[in-house]
């Protein structure tokens, strides 16, 4: 089997390294020609995963035709804001694995990355999601993930990616798996604000617990199964993202406390939570569903509210039964 990995950031590179280390011929497509040439010459992704050697079975390329030639499937590991453009601009693959985490909101309502890819390509899509930091996957530290989609294809993804340090579970709840992976980025932004304000462990535990409740409320209303949000793709991913030094979203929350604005954060790299929170809040307002943590994050990130004022407002909400 030959695999194309589309997207040569940290996550795409880590997945390509994982596959190639198992002897799977893997072509890693980089959007920028200069990056592809550097990957070939240095056998290392110094921009996104410094110190990780590229295995012999990993071949970087800037040519989309070359990347997809003979590939049985394509793994999509691009930022959500670039997903539509990337898929529309590349030759189709027989089927896809979406490793992108994010949300889309428009006239059709809330859509997940796999749903967007499926609509654009009319090909089957499996979502791969979980508490998976690229830095740890690429260094073969123990990791678990979830492959969600059509049962036969999810099992093929399970077999393809599973190994001594990467354990894959299957799920039929693709929508729930993807919603969990998107919402946890919003909650990680909030956790980063708590860290930046030095509000302590009690505050962070309370925020994340209530945030998990919000994830379940949002996710089940959109068709996800409640159990999914208490598994690897929900709670598991939330824990990894909200506490990790690797987490771009948690660090972005800290940066917002220090006065770094949204535009400056986006210039440093994609912060998926900044996009997902817009979709969550827009949907919540349309449906009349309360999402207080997401609304607080939105007010800080997109409306300029002081982070401490936003968190104080959460504490001042009307008392209620848990």
UniProtKB/Swiss-Prot annotation:
The active site is at residue 184. InterPro entries: 6-PGluconate_DH-like_C_sf, 6PGD_dom2, G3P_DH_NAD-dep, G3P_DH_NAD-dep_C, G3P_DH_NAD-dep_N, NAD(P)-bd_dom_sf. NADPH binds at residues 11, 31-32, 101, 134, 248, 270, 272. GO terms for biological process: carbohydrate metabolic process; glycerol-3-phosphate biosynthetic process; glycerol-3-phosphate catabolic process; glycerophospholipid metabolic process; phospholipid biosynthetic process. It is found in: Cytoplasm. Its main location: cytoplasm. Its EC number is 1.1.1.94. It is an enzyme of class 1 (oxidoreductase). This is Glycerol-3-phosphate dehydrogenase [NAD(P)+]. One of its GO terms (molecular function) is glycerol-3-phosphate dehydrogenase [NAD(P)+] activity. Belongs to the NAD-dependent glycerol-3-phosphate dehydrogenase family. Sn-glycerol 3-phosphate binds at residues 101, 130, 184, 237, 247-249. It catalyses: sn-glycerol 3-phosphate + NAD(+) = dihydroxyacetone phosphate + NADH + H(+); sn-glycerol 3-phosphate + NADP(+) = dihydroxyacetone phosphate + NADPH + H(+). Keywords: Cytoplasm, Lipid biosynthesis, Lipid metabolism, NAD, NADP, Nucleotide-binding, Oxidoreductase, Phospholipid biosynthesis, Phospholipid metabolism. GO terms for cellular component: cytosol. Pathway: Membrane lipid metabolism; glycerophospholipid metabolism. It comes from Thermus thermophilus (strain ATCC 27634 / DSM 579 / HB8). Catalyzes the reduction of the glycolytic intermediate dihydroxyacetone phosphate (DHAP) to sn-glycerol 3-phosphate (G3P), the key precursor for phospholipid synthesis.
């Amino acid at each position: 089997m030959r695999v194309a990995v589309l997207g040569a950031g940290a996550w795409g590179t880590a997945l390509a390294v994982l596959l190639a280390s198992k002897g799977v011929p893997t072509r890693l497509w980089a959007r920028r020609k200069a990056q592809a040439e550097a990957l070939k010459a240095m056998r290392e992704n110094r921009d996104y995963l410094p110190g990780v050697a590229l295995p012999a079975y990993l071949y970087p390329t800037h040519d989309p035709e070359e990347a997809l030639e003979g590939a049985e499937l394509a793994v999509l590991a691009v930022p959500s804001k670039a997903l539509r453009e990337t898929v529309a601009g590349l030759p189709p693959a027989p089927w896809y694995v979406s490793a992108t985490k994010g949300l889309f909101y428009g006239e059709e309502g809330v859509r997940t990355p796999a749903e967007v890819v499926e609509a654009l390509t009319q090909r089957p899509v499996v979502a791969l999601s979980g508490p998976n930091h690229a830095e740890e996957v690429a260094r073969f530290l123990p990791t678990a993930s979830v492959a969600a989609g059509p049962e036969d294809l999810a099992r093929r993804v399970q077999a393809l990616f599973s190994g001594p340090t990467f354990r894959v579970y299957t799920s039929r709840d693709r929508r729930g798996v993807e919603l969990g992976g998107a919402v946890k980025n919003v909650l990680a932004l909030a956790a980063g604000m708590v860290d930046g304000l030095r509000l302590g462990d009690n505050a962070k535990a309370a925020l994340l617990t209530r945030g998990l409740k919000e994830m379940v409320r949002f996710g089940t209303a959109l068709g996800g199964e409640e159990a999914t949000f208490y598994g690897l793709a929900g709670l598991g991913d939330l824990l990894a993202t909200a506490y990790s030094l690797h987490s771009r979203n948690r660090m972005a929350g800290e940066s917002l406390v220090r006065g770094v604005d949204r535009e400056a954060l986006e210039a440093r790299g994609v912060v998926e939570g900044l996009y997902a929170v817009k979709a969550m809040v827009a949907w919540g307002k349309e449906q009349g569903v309360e999402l207080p943590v997401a609304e607080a994050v939105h007010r800080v990130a997109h409306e300029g509210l002081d982070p401490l004022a936003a968190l104080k407002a959460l504490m001042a909400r009307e008392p209620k039964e848990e």
